[in-house]
């Protein structure tokens, strides 16, 4: 199965990178801990057990973390990666996943992938926790998206 040539849409890529960051286990744990800390400090501030400064610091920490993971990190990654500005074509078959660029191509065995995830506009194919491909769903025509999903389910064990 072969996709059309595709280009990345900046807004959709940034949204996909947000999904990537928020789906990481360590970031989920950090978000939960900071939210618990913020709720605890708000409660203690309400009952006048802590000073306003402690409450402001916990609120500031929460805002910084949300701005970092929701706005800054996705944009930084997008700007640093030149591949989001190129055109690609993929080919899926029983043995390999092939990525074709206008100047070169590369094939990967399915066993090289660690896991995969689906977000609203992309399939995320992971080599490890930090290295992955974003494959736009709109690169496939008609039933191609479902075919690709079936390949990923069959070939990449989550």
Each PLM stretch: what is its role?
Residues 41-50:
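Juxtamembrane "helix-exit" motif on the non-cytosolic side of transmembrane helices
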Residues 1-40:
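N-terminal membrane-targeting/pre-transmembrane regions
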Residues 34-38, 59-63, 67:
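Alpha-helical transmembrane spans of integral membrane proteins, capturing the lipid-embedded, hydrophobic core
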Residues 91-92, 118, 127:
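Generic beta-strand structural signal
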Residues 97, 106-123:
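Phosphoinositide-dependent membrane-docking surfaces
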Residues 49-62:
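Hydrophobic alpha-helical transmembrane segments
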Residues 67-107:
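Conserved beta-hairpin
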Residues 124-158:
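A membrane-cytosol interface segment of integral membrane proteins
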């Amino acid at each position: 199965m072969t996709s059309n040539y595709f280009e990345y849409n900046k807004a959709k890529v940034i949204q996909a990178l947000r999904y990537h960051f928020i789906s990481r286990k360590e970031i989920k744990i950090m978000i939960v801990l900071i939210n618990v800390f913020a709720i605890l400090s708000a409660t203690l501030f309400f009952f006048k057990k802590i000073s306003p400064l402690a409450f402001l610091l916990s609120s500031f920490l929460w805002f910084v973390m949300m701005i970092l993971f929701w706005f800054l990190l996705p944009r930084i990654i997008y700007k640093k990666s030149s591949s989001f500005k190129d055109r690609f074509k993929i080919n899926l078959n029983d043995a390999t996943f092939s990525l074709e660029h206008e100047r070169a191509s590369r094939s990967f065995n399915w066993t090289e992938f660690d896991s995969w995830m689906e977000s609203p506009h992309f399939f995320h194919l992971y080599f490890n926790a930090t290295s992955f491909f974003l494959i736009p769903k709109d690169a496939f025509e008609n039933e191609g998206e479902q075919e690709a999903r079936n390949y990923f389910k069959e070939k990449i064990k989550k």
